[in-house]
Amino acid sequence: MTKFTTEEVRSKFITYFKTNNHTHVPASSLIPQNDPSLMFVNSGMVQFKNVFTGQEKRPYNKAVTSQKSLRAGGKHNDLENVGYTARHHTFFEMLGNFSFGDYFKEQAIYYAWNLLTKKFELPKNKLYVTIYHTDDEAASYWKKIAGFGDDRIIRIKTNDNFWSMGDTGPCGPCSEIFYDHGENIYGGLPGTKDEDGDRFIEILNMVFMQYEQVDKDTRIELPQKSIDTGMGLERMTAILQHVNNNYDIDLFQKIIDYTENIVKVKVKGEAKFSYRVIADHLRASSFLIADGVIPSNEGRGYVLRRIMRRSMRHAHMLGSKEPLMYKLLPKLVDLMGNIYPELKRSESFISNILEQEEIRFKTTLERGLKLLSEETETLTKGDKLSGEIAFKLYDTYGFPLDLTKDILKNYDISVDHQGFKEQMLAQKERARKSWLGSGEYKTNQLWFDIKEQYGSTEFLGYTLNEAECKIIVLIKDNNLVNNIQETDTQFLLISNQTPFYGESGGQMGDNGTIFAKDSEVEVIDTLKYLGSIIVHKCILKKGKIHVGENANFSIDVKYRQNLRIHHSATHILHAVLHEVLGKHVTQKGSLVAPTYLRFDISYSKAVTNEEITLIEDKVNEIIRANHEVNTTLMATEDAVKQGAMALFGEKYDSEVRVVKMGNNSLELCGGTHVRRLGDIGCFKITNESAIAAGIRRIEAVCGEFVIKLMREKENLLKSVESSLKTNKNELITKVNNILERNKGLEKELEKVHLAHLDLSIDQINKEAEEIKGVKLIYQYIENLNNKVLRQAAENLTKKVEDLIVVYIVGNSDKLSITVAVSKAITDKFNAVNIAKELSLFLGGTGGGGQASLAQAGGHDIGKLNKIHEKLYSLLTVL
């Protein structure tokens, strides 16, 4: 049996099916598109789900893929097992061949058998197959093609060998191929009590989609029968490299060897498992980030964080004091970047996210491990850690439950899952009660009732600025009313149709006016509820307004135009960010206001001044080109095929609105836009900042607001010139001279303060108070910088061997504490401990420093009169 590399196995599989007229389809993102039932793509068939159900047509009827997949929980895939067993992974590659109404059972079995025995040269006597117990057709084909007898064809009655997409829809029997690793490895054949052992390993699974489940009692033959085949790349490679553990294949070994060279710990004993965890989780983390997932505390982001923090804990176990994962990324890119180019494109971004997350977690990891160690001191083998402590580790120290379980597994200690769930539910209940008490619950139910009775609001604003509409709902103080007649009353109004845009997609809602027969209403905002109810937030200016009457709805055209300008600019900005910062940049949020725009992106470092200038230049160049802006309604599938930008994880209707701006931007968008890009006028970035880990925010203005901004800056410059009695050509020189002079004055002032605080040995002996055999100098000072205090306190403790100096400085409503201790007595009196106790007494959170010099903070000025008493009791105890 020839030995193949991982890359050769993948390539040979794809080439084999391409030779047999299958279209090679690239791997889809790990984030399922328009499939809310899945968090991640977990098999090769996911991207073809709509093809199998007949909802989508492709230009081919046979396909082959190498699909990146991810599983981080569920049956046989608990995260805590990854790295400790031979075949558990979070990230893996699923090789697959598919038929959509072309070949079926016999040809699928032939392809699989020929691939394994001819192309991969597996010995026939090492192979067994399973079929669904009633699938005589599959049994006959296995006998015909492989020459197997009944002893090698195992009939399985359970659902393991019958696949379905859900309660209804396509379904069918399966046939699996198993490889025998030999008698020296524990395990039994499928269907036996020892089937979970490692001897007989499933290497290929074929699903014969031949039925449609109409309801729970009715199953009919499908007119178009299909094939879904999956083969795990890592499992197959292990067999072809003559090893029984997936982590021993070349791909993982190269990552492990690379890691070993960095951490300098031998791959043996318990360390071996940590190396495997890191290798597996490096792949999962890197591919998730490449596909737009950012570590967070919910949804996909939390799964990523769980995986990353588990790997970081294992890096910690190997003695890695510095961030490790990002240092391993170049090796992964070298190994997998050619087949998955998104890794290469996003390498810098992935590296930054990995490093930042590890730095952040290291600050709480040590404290969390300390708490866990303290809480398990009295626990022995077989005991349970309380759910309360597990939840505290999760809530306070950022330990996912998987991580706590993973740590305790080494000591045969489990976690009280029920107690953890109760703590989690209690927290949610507290939040729920807060929500119920806020009045939001009642309002929420109201919108559901309105939608059920009246349906959606028709939006007319793409083409009309005013229209006659019928008032169908009036709401005041969360209650339905028939009329509003008190002037200056605030209320909500819903009509059957409206030209007013309800806030959504980042664009703020419209303002304007409503005129009815006897009334005038000011619309101060427009909202959107449940995705399709447009709600006008109103103030009655005069008259009386009734449910059922018609009225003239007129938007503020100038306000809308400014919204259009800034919204269209966000699309151009998005396209340019891809060009300047990289394709891996994804939109994380936006706000389109009439006076500015805000755009949040996944990007792990500050955008440089040079990049900001380049972005501005490119956006303005596109604006000046004055391309036409076109909007089209089309099927979501067609829009995505044309390259329209869509947000990852968003669920879109079957028909979407596509906004095209020349050849520069194509996005799915329901907002309002300019007719030509020249209408934007000009574009200027006003601010760039970090708002969360891996998320940057860009703020900008357009059109007349750029001119306003420039005028404000020009007026400010003139004001500064006037105050400093200079001109703009000499302004920088003048300011630098002033700064230099101020620096000199500050140094002189520091010297004066130090001289004032300095004491001779005789003065120290005279002024110091003696407590428990040591001298204490305590002083409260107003408005003095900490640098001077540190130096002054340290100078005094160097003069006398038994001195403690405590300075407290009041600056506004904050207190700064400086504690210095003569080095000769630090074994008994520790400056850090004294500073910490004083800080806690004054409402602070503790301090830091060294045994001889420490600083801390506080804010409870009312306790200053008791500080001397606190110091006395503290030093007496010490």
Swiss-Prot record:
Gene Ontology molecular function: alanine-tRNA ligase activity; aminoacyl-tRNA deacylase activity; ATP binding; tRNA binding; zinc ion binding
Compartment(s) of residence: Cytoplasm
Enzyme Commission code(s) on record: 6.1.1.7
Required cofactor(s): Zn(2+)
Keyword entries, A-Z: Aminoacyl-tRNA synthetase, ATP-binding, Cytoplasm, Ligase, Metal-binding, Nucleotide-binding, Protein biosynthesis, RNA-binding, tRNA-binding, Zinc
Pfam family of the protein (one): tRNA-synt_2c
Function of the molecule: Catalyzes the attachment of alanine to tRNA(Ala) in a two-step reaction: alanine is first activated by ATP to form Ala-AMP and then transferred to the acceptor end of tRNA(Ala). Also edits incorrectly charged Ser-tRNA(Ala) and Gly-tRNA(Ala) via its editing domain.
Domain notes from UniProt: Consists of three domains; the N-terminal catalytic domain, the editing domain and the C-terminal C-Ala domain. The editing domain removes incorrectly charged amino acids, while the C-Ala domain, along with tRNA(Ala), serves as a bridge to cooperatively bring together the editing and aminoacylation centers thus stimulating deacylation of misacylated tRNAs.
Protein name, as recorded: Alanine--tRNA ligase
Species in which this protein is naturally found: Rickettsia canadensis (strain McKiel)
Lineage: Bacteria, Pseudomonadati, Pseudomonadota, Alphaproteobacteria, Rickettsiales
UniProt gene name: alaS
